[in-house]
A protein has these predicted regions:
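Short, solvent-exposed loop/helix junctions and linker helices
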Residues: 54, 107-110, 146
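Short low-complexity, flexible loop/linker segments enriched in glycine and/or proline
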Residues: 18-21, 91-92, 142-146
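Acceptor-substrate binding/catalytic loop of class I
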Residues: 78, 95-115
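Short alpha-helix
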Residues: 107-130
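Conserved SAM-binding loop
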Residues: 1-86, 113-116, 154-158
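Short, flexible, mixed-charge acidic loops at enzyme active sites
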Residues: 85-95
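Residue-level marker for beta-strand->alpha-helix junctions and adjacent short loops that shape enzyme
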Residues: 81, 135-137
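Core SAM-dependent methyltransferase catalytic element
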Residues: 140-159
Length: 159
C-alpha cells in the first residue's frame, strides 16, 4: 500500500492526476504529518524537497519519526544552505529561468547536511547514506554526485 500526504490540496490534486495516468493505486491525504494520527506506521517515508518549506522543522521531523515503523527508512532530499544553492535554486530557478514562482524558497530555511544529520540523530535516527544530486538542465536529468553543495539526500533508519 502506498500513501501520499501533502499540506497543499493543489499538490494532492496534481499527484492524483499523475497516479491516474500511470494507473497507480495511491491513497492521498491532504494533511501535514504533525496532524496525522496513524495507527499503521510506515515502512518508508520519502521527504523529497519538503523540509525546506516547513514552518517548524523539529516538530515535522519528530512527526516523521513517530509515523515510521521501527527500523523504517526515511529519505530526506533538500537544499543545502550555501552561496551556490542560493544562486542556483533561488536566483537561477526562480528569477532567471522562472521554473518556480518567485518566493518559492527561503534560503534561511535551507539546511546544511550536518545540521540535518544532527537533528535526525537527536531523534534516534541512524544515518545510512548521503549523496549529492545535480541537475543537468540541458539533458533534463538528475545525477548522483559527491557534491552536496546544492541538492542532497540523506538516508536514515529509525533506531
Amino acid at each position: 500500500n502506498v500513501t501520499g500526504i501533502d499540506a497543499s490540496d493543489k499538490n494532492i490534486q496534481v499527484a492524483k492526476l499523475h497516479a491516474k495516468k500511470k494507473n497507480l493505486n495511491i491513497n492521498y491525504i491532504n494533511i501535514v504529518p504533525e496532524n496525522l494520527k496513524q495507527l499503521n506506521k510506515f515502512d518508508i517515508i520519502l521527504n523529497l524537497e519538503v523540509v525546506e518549506h516547513v514552518e517548524n522543522l523539529d516538530l515535522y521531523l519528530e512527526s516523521c519519526f513517530r509515523l515510521l515503523k521501527p527500523k523504517g527508512i526515511m529519505f530526506t532530499a533538500t537544499l543545502n544552505r550555501t552561496l551556490t544553492s542560493y544562486i542556483k535554486a533561488i536566483v537561477g530557478a526562480e528569477y532567471i529561468l522562472r521554473w518556480l514562482p518567485i518566493g518559492t524558497h527561503d534560503w534561511n530555511k535551507f539546511i546544511k547536511p550536518e545540521e540535518l544529520e544532527k537533528k535526525l540523530t537527536r531523534l534516534n535516527f541512524l544515518m545510512l547514506d548521503s549523496t549529492g544530486l545535480n541537475f543537468n538542465p540541458f539533458l533534463q536529468v538528475w545525477n548522483r554526485s559527491k557534491n552536496l553543495s546544492v541538492n542532497y539526500i540523506l538516508v536514515s533508519k529509525k533506531n
